[in-house]
UniProtKB/Swiss-Prot annotation:
This is Uncharacterized protein in pufB 5'region. It comes from Blastochloris viridis (Rhodopseudomonas viridis). It holds the Pfam family Oxidored_nitro. One of its GO terms (molecular function) is oxidoreductase activity. Coiled coil: none annotated. It comes from the Bacteria. GO terms for biological process: chlorophyll biosynthetic process; photosynthesis.
Length: 255
């Protein structure tokens, strides 16, 4: 038997343990449902439940955590898994593949080590980072953390809900950012036409982002691309304008 991660896995673990020991696990399971697991239903019924089916996550951790968290979040909770990398004893991890996955898939939540946190910072990602492996600046003294058992399952869902709230916060414009907007031109700009390949590049850039933040992201990128086109005297928005706008936005987030 291995220490379980997730609700169904924990229940199956306890029943298997009961068969091996000759003890009845059902009273304990029922008691846990009324106590330890009870907050989970409140978390599930919160406003963030609407985002579970469209929210994505990635994980890079040891094999037990990667397999367990992926099964729990993807199979039991309905989140979308963008990538999952397992670290095994005696096998050197492919950090390059992890970095590339983070840069290309751009999940909303990333479970991992300090390495993954650095990879997110490199591309200015707004993904929410949740520590799930070493090395990392991480303190785990409470019994519900790490993520094993019923207490761990409740803890993980709580962290995911908080991450979704943080993602919503990142969408909101800050007052200091609103103060930095360009002055209104004396002559109003007419709507700028887009080349088909430029619009396709815009769609591809937004498609790679989590559903929750696409609405705000597409507006920022579209406005930035049109500003780039006007700045260089283009009459239409080109692929190059979209690429420069995306690079500028990523660079600004990273700063």
């Amino acid at each position: 038997l291995q220490a379980p991660i997730g609700l169904h896995s924990t229940t199956a673990f306890l029943r298997a343990l009961g068969e091996l020991t000759g003890l009845d696990p059902e009273p304990f399971i029922e008691r846990e449902k009324r106590t330890t697991i009870r907050p989970l239903w409140d978390l599930w019924r919160s406003m963030t439940q609407d985002f579970f089916g469209t929210s994505s996550f990635g994980i890079a951790a040891n094999e037990t955590y990667t397999r367990g968290l992926r099964h729990f979040l993807e199979e039991e909770m309905g989140l979308l898994c963008s990538f999952a990398f397992s670290r095994k004893p005696g096998v050197k991890p492919d950090n390059g593949a992890v970095r590339q996955a983070i840069q290309t898939s751009m999940p909303l939540i990333v479970f991992g080590r300090y390495n993954e946190r650095m990879y997110l910072a490199e591309v200015g990602s707004r993904a929410i980072f949740i520590p799930a492996s070493f090395p990392g600046a991480i303190v785990r003294r409470y019994t519900g953390t790490p993520v094993m058992g019923y207490a761990g399952a409740t803890y993980v869902v709580q962290e995911v809900c908080n991450a979704l709230y943080d993602a919503l916060f990142n969408i909101l414009p800050l007052g200091t950012e609103l103060d930095k907007v360009e002055a209104t031109p004396a002559r109003r700009h007419k709507e700028m036409p887009w080349n088909d390949d430029a619009r396709a590049a815009l769609d591809d850039s937004v498609e790679a982002l989590p559903v929750l933040i696409r609405t705000s992201a597409v507006k920022r990128l579209r406005d930035a691309a049109e500003r780039e086109a006007r700045a260089v005297g283009e009459e239409r928005v080109t692929v190059a304008c979209v690429a420069r706008a995306r690079a500028a936005l990523v660079g600004g987030q990273a700063a």
